[in-house]
């Protein structure tokens, strides 16, 4: 107990799923994702830090943070949505970005799907190369 208050471990630590390390993320993507996980409300899976706040916390520029946020969205780890704020005089103004941490299984499924598409494309390319090589060999022999 610190200063007479019971400390809650959940307020001081957060868990990053092991699967994050098999999704082919760059170090910058992992850092930004980890920061968003640190900030998230554990009940709603949402948080509202600005690009500037994230950048200050992880040592990146606003543009770099934006790039990694877009990459995390594309890889289905997070979803984002702009918020609106009403000013005191009643005008609507852009607020911070709302980040929602998506279930890790969605990202795993998407990653696996993309890997399968790459494998099928690679197999098709190899079959085409083999067919072309056979065709070339067949026609080369006729020309002689």
Describe every region a protein language model picked out:
Residues 9-24:
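Short, Lys/Arg-enriched N-terminal segment that forms or immediately precedes the first helix
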